[in-house]
Amino acid sequence: MVAYWRQAGLSYIRYSQICAKVVRDALKTEFKANAKKTSGNSVKIVKVKKE
């Protein structure tokens, strides 16, 4: 069984982005501001200093 997103020719990352946007768009107005604020990048890259 192949996942629907794979059959549509999408990567999982793109599929999850589309799903997140649909959920944010479906929110009530009072919750949209908080959702947009937290929808940014959630990955932080830190370079390790070598001693």
Curated annotation (Swiss-Prot):
Modified residue annotations for N6-acetyllysine: K21
Biological processes, Gene Ontology terms: proton motive force-driven ATP synthesis; proton motive force-driven mitochondrial ATP synthesis
Compartment(s) of residence: Mitochondrion inner membrane
Entry GO CC: mitochondrial inner membrane; mitochondrion; proton-transporting ATP synthase complex
Family per similarity comment: Belongs to the eukaryotic ATPase epsilon family.
Function: Mitochondrial membrane ATP synthase (F(1)F(0) ATP synthase or Complex V) produces ATP from ADP in the presence of a proton gradient across the membrane which is generated by electron transport complexes of the respiratory chain. F-type ATPases consist of two structural domains, F(1) - containing the extramembraneous catalytic core, and F(0) - containing the membrane proton channel, linked together by a central stalk and a peripheral stalk. During catalysis, ATP synthesis in the catalytic domain of F(1) is coupled via a rotary mechanism of the central stalk subunits to proton translocation.
Protein name: ATP synthase subunit epsilon-like protein, mitochondrial
Organism: Homo sapiens
Organism classification: Eukaryota, Metazoa, Chordata, Craniata, Vertebrata
